[in-house]
Design a protein with these regions (language model features):
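Sec-dependent N-terminal signal peptides
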Residues: 1-5
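C-terminal motif of bacterial Sec signal peptides marking the signal peptidase cleavage site
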Residues: 9-13
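A residue-level marker of the well-folded mature domains of exported/periplasmic proteins
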Residues: 18-415
Length: 415
């Protein structure tokens, strides 16, 4: 995979008005804007069924951006759905930077009575750990983080999902489209080049674009891919510029791991097929949208909230799967190739059954060689020292909770 840097920067991650419990009022009852971002305190709602209702939990959520970010909107929607399903009170804080503001937001939520607090961005982690140490009676969870298994705190947890499975399936959708373009004479086999707009050179991003590429190559053997990085999780101008440069460089299909509409809208303007992330972009890009993969966080939120209600421990590392409903594809767009739905369903069944492993070492090489062994940096020291063997049984074991839930695949494969 060819990687290009587009303004890559130094590595960095992906007010408390209390609300009265109202029982049936789903409306937001307070909203204030503070220096750290926006706080919304939402009232409790009736649980979907009596059997779903929990008591004794007030949840607080910290988001890097607001609903304008597809990444954060995905979390916002899941938090709302889970809390309303379980009938609990919850508060949200949006536009919280990856800095001391995250610690302050966590403390404000704890002081407002939240006993389950969740933060959604990689760079929030150190500040949430700091808050967890200060509030030992509050349970804190953090998405995409790497340190729960080494911190040794009973009240700090990491969570993620096997989104590489979703990316792989989305790659199959892309590969099927490339095959259609080849069959129609729009491109030759040698011109089946995809482009990928990534945010940072994190393992999470590398894991994602590699699984997407492997999915595409499983059905379109001649595919190649160029990858570029913007140095930001959310920069619509940079993402649009990156997509346009990839298109100008001969890429005939674009995907991304960045949070704005920059790449999808560039594709719609250029008439280039697009595979998006974190939610369907079909409404804005009806002519070029193919599919989107996402982590569905609702199952994790329900699990963690029920643990707090029951007084049972939350897993130190939790990784959702296709089976738990934590990894999802959107509905297919109208521009997909014929037979795509059937190909995706067959591949999904094989992934769930364990017949297919995304990082099967027989399906890729690194510098022309099979990856028979690889030590990953699981414990995350400042020097990123490799410390655990993660290749066994013929495949790279990504996001294995025996190690940690956050991705650690940081291998640049051939292609």
């Amino acid at each position: 995979l060819a990687a290009m840097a587009l303004a890559v920067t130094a590595l960095a991650g992906c007010g408390s008005n209390d609300a009265a419990t109202t029982g049936t009022d789903a409306a937001t009852v307070a909203a204030t804007t503070e220096a750290a971002g926006t706080t919304e305190a939402a009232g409790t709602t009736e649980a979907a069924t009596d059997s779903e209702a929990v008591t004794g939990v007030k949840a607080g959520f910290i988001f890097l951006h607001d609903e304008n970010s597809t990444y954060d909107l995905n979390f916002l929607n899941a938090a709302k759905a889970a809390c309303e399903k379980l009938g609990i009170e919850y508060m949200t804080k949006t536009n919280i930077p990856e800095g001391q503001e995250a610690y302050e937001a966590a403390c404000e939520l704890a002081d407002a009575g939240c006993n389950f607090i969740f933060a959604d961005s990689f760079g929030h982690e150190d500040y949430i750990i700091e808050a967890a140490k200060e509030y030992p009676d509050v349970q804190f969870s953090h998405a995409t983080g790497t340190k729960a298994h080494t911190e040794g705190l009973d009240n700090f947890h990491n969570a993620f999902a096997s989104i590489y499975d979703g990316r792989y399936l989305a790659g199959i959708v892309a590969g099927m489209k490339l095959n259609e373009m080849i069959a129609n004479g729009d491109i030759t086999e040698d011109q089946a080049k995809m482009g990928y707009v990534g945010a940072y050179t994190y393992a999470e991003v590398m894991s994602g674009y590699t699984s997407f590429f492997l999915g595409a190559r499983s059905v379109c053997p001649s595919v190649t891919m160029d990858v570029t990085f913007t140095g930001s999780w959310y920069d619509e101008t940079a993402e649009k510029e990156a997509a346009n440069k990839l298109i100008e460089g001969g890429c005939v299909l674009i995907s991304q791991h960045a949070d704005s509409m920059g790449a999808p809208t560039a594709c719609e303007t250029a008439g280039v097929p697009n595979v998006s992330y974190n939610g369907s972009t079909e409404a804005a890009c009806p002519n070029t949208f193919l599919v989107s993969s996402r982590v569905n966080w609702e199952p994790y939120f329900e699990y963690a909230i029920k643990c707090v209600a029951d007084g049972t421990p939350i897993d130190t590392d939790w990784c959702g799967t296709l089976e738990t409903g934590s990894v999802e594809l959107s509905d297919l767009g109208t521009a997909v190739a014929e037979g795509t739905a059937e190909a995706v369903e067959a591949a999904k069944a094989d992934l769930i059954a364990g017949k297919t492993h995304v990082y099967d070492i027989t399906t890729f090489t690194v510098d022309g060689k099979t990856l028979d062994s690889y030590e990953a940096d699981i414990d995350t020291d400042p020097d990123y020292t490799p410390d655990h063997e993660v290749v066994s049984d013929g495949y790279f074991h990504e996001s294995d909770v025996a190690f940690r839930s956050a991705p650690y695949f940081n291998v640049r494969i051939d292609g």
